[in-house]
Amino acid sequence: MNVANVPASRIVLLGQSLGTAVASGVAEHFAQEGIDFAGVILVSGFSSLPTMLGHYSIAGYIPVLLPLRSWPWLLDLVLSRIVDKWASADRWRQTARTVKQRDGRLRLSLIHAKNDWDIPSGEDDGLFAAAVRGIVGEGDLVDEDTLAAEKERRTTSNGKNAFVATWKDQDMIVRQELFPYGGKPTTTSGGGKQTRHR
């Protein structure tokens, strides 16, 4: 920002797949410094690496850790060995809380394709819930059922496997958008051909 002489208010952070963890970390760091970006867009994001890997399937077909689900203690042991957790959900809870406390500005957009075979689209639900918990200021006191009902009320369906959920509070907006098809090659670029649809 200083080198290019561009204010944060004119910068949008964009992260895709593993890059969403980096964008989340950058947003959290600068939020703690009192700096708000024009927006943050996370495409195919995930709540944390251990959570995502617990449901990860190669090409959408080969569930890497499925055999370990029969022994939850073993799955927990394997996942506990992950050094870098990339806990984006925790980061967004804290970032939203920090921005809210100082009456700052937040624009977070979560974009995912239902047929993304690398990162399950449900991972965005965790990011959305975490950011909302940071905004409402009750942290973990917002129970799942209440949050789900409130999210449903703020959601517009765009057909099968497609919706937009928007949470607005003062100058803070968290938006989650699900598309039925796209995966990573086509969701962001419009290019690439992804022929396998689930």
Spell out what each predicted region is.
Residues 1-9:
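Conserved acidic catalytic loop of the alpha/beta-hydrolase fold
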Residues 102-104, 109-112, 116:
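Short beta-strand/loop motif that positions the catalytic acidic residue
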